[in-house]
Design a protein with these regions (language model features):
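Beta-strand elements of repeat-based all-beta scaffolds
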Residues: 1-16, 20-122, 126-143, 147-177
C-alpha cells in the first residue's frame, strides 16, 4: 500500500495493496471534509465551530449525525439510513463507561485510579480483565473463560515476551540499531 501527503503532512491519497485508491480533501482547519473511494462514492463531512464532526453524508444522503455533551464528548451517533443510534455514557472523569450500539447491546468499562481500563463487560455479561505494570503497560489480559495472555517488557519498555491464551510464547530480541 502507499500514501501521498500534502505540504502539511496530511494524507491526500491512499492506495491499497489491491490498487484501490481513496482520496481525501481537508478544510482550512485540517478536518477531512471529503472522502472519495475507489468506486467513486463520496462522503462529505461537516464540522461545528469547535471542529467536532457533526455529520457524514454519503453520495448526497445524510447518513450519520454526531451529538456531543457540554464537555465536548461524543454522546450519540445516529444513522438515518437505519434510524438507529449508538450512545456513550461517561463518568465524572470523562471516561466512557457504557456504550450502547445500534442493536441495543450494552458494553460496560471499568477503570482504575490511573484511568486505565481494568474490566470490559460485553452485552452477554462476558468480562475481560486487564492488569498493568507500574509503567501503564498491559501485562495480563484474562477473558470470561479464565484464559489469560501475558506480555513481558524489558527495562526499556519494549515487549520482551508474549504468551497467548493457549500458552504459546513469542520472544523478542532487539539489536542496537
Amino acid at each position: 500500500s502507499s500514501k501521498t501527503y500534502d505540504k502539511y503532512g496530511r494524507v491526500v491519497k491512499e492506495v491499497s495493496n489491491t490498487n484501490e485508491a481513496t482520496d481525501y480533501e481537508y478544510d482550512k482547519y485540517g478536518n477531512v471534509v471529503k472522502t472519495m473511494n475507489h468506486l467513486g462514492s463520496v462522503t462529505d463531512s461537516t464540522y461545528d465551530l469547535l471542529n467536532r464532526k457533526v455529520s457524514d453524508s454519503t453520495d448526497g444522503k445524510k447518513t450519520l449525525t454526531y451529538s456531543y455533551d457540554a464537555k465536548g464528548q461524543l454522546v450519540s451517533t445516529h444513522d438515518s439510513f437505519t434510524d438507529k443510534t449508538d450512545t456513550v455514557k461517561y463518568d465524572a472523569l470523562g471516561q466512557a463507561v457504557e456504550k450502547t450500539d445500534k442493536l441495543g447491546n450494552v458494553t460496560k468499562t471499568d477503570y482504575d485510579a490511573k484511568g486505565q481500563v481494568i474490566k470490559e463487560t460485553d452485552a452477554a455479561g462476558n468480562a475481560t480483565l486487564k492488569e498493568y505494570d507500574i509503567y501503564g503497560n498491559v501485562i495480563k489480559e484474562t477473558d470470561a473463560l479464565g484464559n489469560s495472555s501475558q506480555t513481558h517488557y524489558n527495562a526499556f519498555g519494549l515487549v520482551e515476551k508474549e504468551v497467548d491464551k493457549r500458552g504459546f510464547a513469542v520472544s523478542y530480541v532487539y539489536n542496537d540499531k
